[in-house]
């Protein structure tokens, strides 16, 4: 039986990953939106500019779709394979940091969906790292 901290961390990870799927789905919808963006707040915050830029696609696949699939994969790993989840969350965080740099330095505009996803994946990484450490300690104490 798993300890309550492990169960709590698993629940938090699943909730965060589901939030990531939702935010990525909104960005995915924005990628194909031809109407004015609902999150075009001002000249510094505009999801339309970000999601229609050439940086929003990797090998003809929208980055938002990668996010949907990635968060779904991470959710499926929560509580089952903590070390693998932490490794994949780190890879996702590195990819996200690259996209954050693109928003900041190249596009010079921010997307609220993207920033939300950045916060979510950073939190997922930290919690999954903690879960992996606790899992390893539990195995060692057996």
Which residue ranges define each predicted feature?
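Membrane-interfacial helix-loop segments of redox and metal-homeostasis proteins
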Residues: 1-142
